[in-house]
């Protein structure tokens, strides 16, 4: 078998329904749109959330809360991503960006504790979860809190 000979299993794929192509197809004449009316027209139908003139749900419910403009957004990574560094390396957000562990810095980097770390590293300038800090120290590394 070659790549160009691959085919889906028989019966696993069905052709799309072609509407408005004759009565013999079962979807001719009105093409599944019923008789006249708004929904039978081209571009017909109502917008999402429209309830026929009744006060819609999104307007019946009260407004609540606000978006805090001072929220800090951190890029998160797990400790197992730090195994790419050599023993004794000082890991900073700038180094993580340079080595493409993170794609952007936003308001900083937070290291979470998922996975295991085998290297002895010094972490500087990053926020850490409690588990991540414990794992880094247990591996012989140091944590300099931001």
UniProtKB/Swiss-Prot annotation:
Residues 21-31, 42-52 have a biased composition (Gly residues). Residues 1-54 are annotated as: Disordered. One of its GO terms (biological process) is translation. GO terms for molecular function: rRNA binding; structural constituent of ribosome. One of its GO terms (cellular component) is cytosolic large ribosomal subunit. Belongs to the universal ribosomal protein uL15 family. Part of the 50S ribosomal subunit. This is Large ribosomal subunit protein uL15. It comes from Clostridium perfringens (strain 13 / Type A). The lineage of its organism: Bacteria, Bacillati, Bacillota, Clostridia, Eubacteriales.
